[in-house]
Structures are given as C-alpha cells and as structure tokens.
Amino acid sequence: MREIIARALKASKADYTEIRLERREASKVVYRGRELETADVTIDVGGIVRALCKDGGWGIATFNSLEGLEERVEQAYQCARAVQGEPIELAPVPPVEDRITVELEKDFRGISLSEKRRLIEGYNEILLSHDKIQDTHAVYSDTFSRIYYANSEGTFIEEERPLVSIVLVATAREGDNVQRGHEALSLPKGFEAVEGREELAERLSLIHI
C-alpha cells in the first residue's frame, strides 16, 4: 500500500499533495426472527486527495478504488490550478513516520463466517425461547480498518482500528400490550469480546409486560 501511495504522490505536479485512504474489511450476520437475513463479508477502499497550488488554491478528488489513484492526484491538481485566490504558504512541519498497530486476543478476521453465525444464532435462540417474545433482530458485525495518511513532504502514518459488535432487539407481546427492548455491545477488541455474552440475551428476554 505504501508503494502505491508513494508512487501517486511522486507523480503530483502540485506544490503540496496529501492522500488519506481507508481500507476496511467487514463481516455481518443478521437474524430476523428465525430467518437468517444477511451473512456477508466485504472489503472497501476509499479516500481523498488534496492538492495545493500556491498561486491558486486547494483542489480535492475522492476515490473508492486504488485503480487510477495517480489520475485522482492529477484531478486534484487541476482543480487546485483552477482556483483563483490569494497566494497560500504552508507552515513548515517536519515529516512524521508512524505505524499504530493492534494485537487482538482472538482476531475476528481469522474466525469463519459460520462460527460468527453460530454465535449470534445462539443469542437469538435464547430470546426466541421465551414465549412472550414475538419477534427478534440479532446482529453480529466486525470491521478492521487500516487508515493511511501520507503527504508529499515525507509524512506517512498508518493506523489499525478494529471494532466488533453485537446488537439484540426483541419485541414482546401480551394481548394488546407490546414492549420492545434492546441490548448492544461494541468494543475495539477481538472476537473474544462478544463470546459468552448470553447474559445480554437473558436480560433482554425479561422485558416486562
């Protein structure tokens, strides 16, 4: 990734260029009642290029693919050239290199989608086992993002951001009386953070009617 970004920055004709990029891996499993509604894995890439021409101004280009990144840099440069404004001088800032990584006890990227499905299915079944609960919505999701920032002055920063979540929603009914409740958990940790959380489902199942 660093080589791709560096190559795009090197191709820039602007006085100053910066690229912010995010690559996000995500998985999601959703139950609605007893029906498995969603089970998928996605990988997304996107970001923004900012270019400065000192005798013009700032130009911006966005992207959602690494293909053609150099073209997006050129587009930002052309936008900057088209801007009419006062000359701009940036304050001198020494280049920074940093890499912020995380160590997950149980990296959810190494857990199969079927195991994630079994986990949220188990919590959903706890809710459905109670007679008064008529409908449920149970969601497992995780995301692992890598955030990159680089500029033409030599700064390069990479940061990892994990997030794992479960959301449980239940609707209980007794006659005309309907109550809805939910429990949720979202933490910047690994798969272990959402294992053994049966108490969330049990607590939610005690909706007072």
What are these regions (language model features)?
Residues 1-207:
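Active-site bordering "gate/hinge" segments
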